[in-house]
Each structure stands twice: as C-alpha cells, then as structure tokens.
Regions:
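An N-terminal alpha-helical hairpin/helix-loop-helix interaction module that forms a charged
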Residues: 1-138, 156-168
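Acidic, metal/ion-handling microdomains and their immediate structural contexts
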Residues: 148
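Conserved SAM-binding loop
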Residues: 151
Length: 168
C-alpha cells in the first residue's frame, strides 16, 4: 500500500545524471575552506551508516539515528516536516529497515545502475517501505524530498531530488 499518487522517481538518462553528479562535486569543492560546513554532515552520516552495517545492538541503532537526525536537520529537512515535533529516535524503525538484507544491492549505487529500471523500481519499493515505517510509528508521511535525503544519507543510492536537482 503506497502513499504516493505518482512515483517520486524516474529513470534519468546517464548524461543528465553525470551532470548532476558533477554539480555535486562543484558544491563539494566550494565548501573545502570550511571544515564545519553543514554539507559535511552528509559525509559523517553516510560514513557512519557504511561503517556500521548490520547493527545488532540498540546503542548502534541509537548512534545511527542521531547521525541521520542531525544530517537531516543540517540540510533543512525539519522545516515544515513532521520531524520538527519528534526526537531523533523516530528514525529507529527506518534505520532497522534499510539494513535488512533485501536492500543490500542498493548501497552506493553507481550512476550506471541508478539509470536502470530494475534499480529504480527497487528504490521505489524501499521508499514505500520507509514511508510505511514512519506512518506505523505515528510520525507522518515523508515528502519525496525527505525520502531522497534519507536514502542519500544512509544507503547512498540516489541523489536528493530537491528543487535544485529537479531544476538540473
């Protein structure tokens, strides 16, 4: 059961995807001078998720929830969101979900794989599962932008489909 009237993702041609990735590199280059730039929170968040594959203890889940919450906050994802009224532990079920073996093939997808319909469908299924996890925990329905920021910061399988990416 899905909460989207239309899929938030579509298969993007590789040239456009490569251009978007290049824009990301340029953004990264522009923040090199500030060792505490807010965009670095993505690196810390995604790095924590990559280093802690298959978390078995609640303390690790808690640690990853904190990383995810701060990353989302630093990227402005609390504004006008159900997350504004929740603590960081609201992400626990989502953290457990993304570590299920079912999603292993989505971790750090290459642009070539991202442009394939098979992976686009898998990302859609994971997005729907994330939405269902938040709804089941009484949180709310995440926007498409929030979903892609979560996927970017954790699994690293999509760029964030925010207004800048959509414009590109």
């Amino acid at each position: 059961h899905t909460h989207h009237s239309k899929p938030p993702y579509r298969v993007v041609d590789q040239k456009k995807l490569a251009e978007a990735i290049q824009a990301g590199y340029e953004c990264y280059d522009s923040m090199k001078d500030d060792p505490h730039h807010r965009y670095l929170s993505w690196e810390y968040c995604h790095g924590a998720f990559r280093l802690n594959r298959r978390p078995q203890i609640d303390a690790t889940i808690d640690y990853l929830c904190l990383h995810l919450a701060w990353y989302l906050a630093s990227w402005g994802m609390l504004r006008n969101s159900f997350l504004m009224q929740k603590d960081y532990k609201i992400h626990a079920d989502v953290v457990r979900l993304i570590y299920q073996p079912e999603w292993d093939d989505l971790w750090d997808l290459s642009p070539e794989k991202l442009s394939q319909e098979y992976y686009a469908d898998r990302i859609m299924k994971l997005s729907e599962s994330i939405t269902e996890a938040y709804v089941a925990s009484g949180a709310g329905i995440p926007t498409d932008t929030l979903l892609t920021k979560i996927l970017l910061g954790t699994v690293g399988c999509v760029p964030a489909y925010d207004r800048y990416f959509k414009k590109a």
